[in-house]
Each structure stands twice: as C-alpha cells, then as structure tokens.
UniProtKB/Swiss-Prot annotation:
Name of the protein in its database record: Potassium-transporting ATPase subunit beta
Domain notes: The C-terminal lobe folds into an immunoglobulin-like domain and mediates cell adhesion properties.
GO BP, sorted A to Z: cell adhesion; intracellular potassium ion homeostasis; intracellular sodium ion homeostasis; pH reduction; potassium ion import across plasma membrane; regulation of proton transport; sodium ion export across plasma membrane
Annotated effect of mutating residue 201 to S: Impairs the assembly of an active pump and its targeting to the plasma membrane
The encoding gene: ATP4B
Highest classification ranks of the organism: Eukaryota, Metazoa, Chordata, Craniata, Vertebrata
Organism of this sequence: Oryctolagus cuniculus
Length: 291
C-alpha cells in the first residue's frame, strides 16, 4: 500500500515522459510504431478527403437549384418604394427649406441633382439601346453581349427643363424647383395592365391652410414611366439598367409658408395607402421657400 502511494520524483516523471516520446526497446514514438503512424495518417487523410468531396458535392447540387439571375433576398412588399432627389432628411422625414435670394441655401440641392443625373449622361448610357415601344419589353432569351439582356436608354435630356442642361439652377433660383421621382426596382414587376404608370403631385391638406391646387409641369410629358423599361430582370441579367425618372417642376409653391407635397405613383399594381411604409408607392416631403 505504501508503494502505491509513493510519490515519484521530478526526474522520474521526466524519464517516463521521455520514454513515452521515444521507446528505443520497441521503436515506438508516442505509443505507436512508425508503421502504425503511417497507417493512421493515411486513414485520416482518406477520411477528410472523402468528407471534403461529399461537402463539395452537396454545395454543387445546391448551387444547381439556385437561379443566378434571381436575387437571394427580396422584399415582401408588392409595390415599389419611391425615392426623391434632392433628398434632405430632417427629424421627421424629408424636409427641404431654402431662400431664393441666398444661393448658398440651394446650391447643395442643385449639386445633388447634378451628381444624381451624371449616371444618365449619354456616355453613361452608351451600352443601352434606344427603345420606342409603348408596351412591355419582354426578353425570354439573353440576346445582349456577355449573356445579358438589353436595357433601354434613359438620358437626362428627357427631363427637358428639369435636366439641368437648359437651367443649371433646376428652377430653385426662381422659386419653381424641380424634384426627381424614381421607383425602386422589383425583379419582373409589371406596374400596370396596359397604361404606363404616372406621377401625380399635390399639396397635402393641412389644418388652417387654404392652398390653391398645386400646378406641376412633368417631364417626360404627363409624368409617365414608359412601359418599355419594364420588366426589370435583375442586376446580373441587366448590368447597365437605369431606372426611368420623372421630374416634377412645382410652379405655384407659396413663399414663406411650409407646405407638404405628396407625389404618388398611379398604376394598376402600385399601392400607396400602406400605413406601415410611408414610401411604398409614394413620397411625401415638406417644402418651404423663403423670399
């Protein structure tokens, strides 16, 4: 019993560990002979090669079921969101205030518009084609170069007086500002049955305000998005796609008064009454022009 409880010295423990690492009597290293180390190494190499192959095969089969031309993630909204340029956000949404006589208050707004429209220059649209059809541009095959689909041109000059080409101030200098409305992209979305969607901007009724109806000039005419820009087939299928735009030039905004402007998309398949998403099918912003 006393022998079992005998404590080993440090040198004895080191000698046992050295003997475990290499036993000259049996030729074992770490408890195994060289041949057994070779066999166990080959076993693990073969095991992990097979496991890696099975994993790669599973990934390959999975990738064959995924359409590379369909986005991995899509919103649950059935109608596209609507965005505005210039976009200046305040504490409670879009708020645009400026003074006609002080160009420092609206220079940044026009700069935002010019920067945004730079992507709609003829040079930026060189890979797109001219479209004149008044119907949807369906493309079942990949007829464009590099296995892609064609995209229709939309250039800034289509916005005419709101293009920044004839009036670099976009109407802000004279108190008749231009605002650009854009619908967000939804893959294979068709906004209407046969008539093109159009933009309609109005003053939003506010208590204690008696406003005359808002007068608007729309560009392109009637504020419509041509149907040949739809459907959108995704970024990989249409890498050069440009969203169509509508510019609204507000003609009779009262000065020194904050008004709320509502611009909504009128189309068969676009809704704008979702209480949970203020930008679905419409955009609302506050505007105050000082003089």
């Amino acid at each position: 019993m006393a022998a079992l409880q005998e404590k080993k010295s440090c040198s004895q423990r080191m000698e046992e560990f050295r003997h475990y690492c290499w036993n000259p009597d049996t030729g074992q290293m770490l408890g195994r002979t060289l041949s057994r180390w070779v066999w166990i190494s080959l076993y693990y190499v073969a095991f992990y090669v097979v496991m890696t192959g099975l994993f790669a095969l599973c990934i390959y089969v999975l990738m064959q079921t995924i359409d590379p031309y369909t986005p991995d993630y899509q919103d649950q909204l059935k109608s596209p969101g609507v965005t505005l340029r210039p976009d200046v956000y305040g504490e409670k949404g879009l708020e645009i205030h400026y003074n006609i006589s002080d160009n420092r208050t609206w220079t940044s707004l026009t700069h935002t518009l010019r920067s945004f429209l730079a992507g709609y220059s003829p040079a930026a649209q060189v890979d797109n084609i001219n479209c004149t059809s008044k119907t949807y541009f369906f493309q079942e095959s990949f007829g464009a170069p590099n296995h892609t689909k064609f995209s229709c041109k939309f250039t800034a000059d289509m916005l005419e007086n709101c293009s920044g080409l004839t009036d670099p101030s976009f109407g802000f200098k004279e108190g008749k500002p231009c605002f650009i409305i854009k619908m967000n992209r939804i893959v294979r979305f068709l906004p209407s049955n046969s008539t093109p969607p159009r933009v309609d901007c109005t003053f939003l009724d506010m208590p204690h305000q008696a406003l005359t109806p808002l007068q608007v000039e729309y560009y392109p005419p009637n504020g419509t998005f041509s149907l040949h820009y739809f459907p959108y087939y995704g970024k990989k299928a249409q890498p050069h796609y440009s969203n169509p735009l509508v510019a609204a030039k507000l003609l009779n905004v009262p000065t020194n008064t904050e008004v709320v402007v509502l611009c909504k998309i009128l189309a068969d398949h676009v809704t704008f009454d979702n209480p949970h998403d203020p930008y679905e099918g419409k955009v609302e912003f506050k505007l105050k022009i000082q003089k």
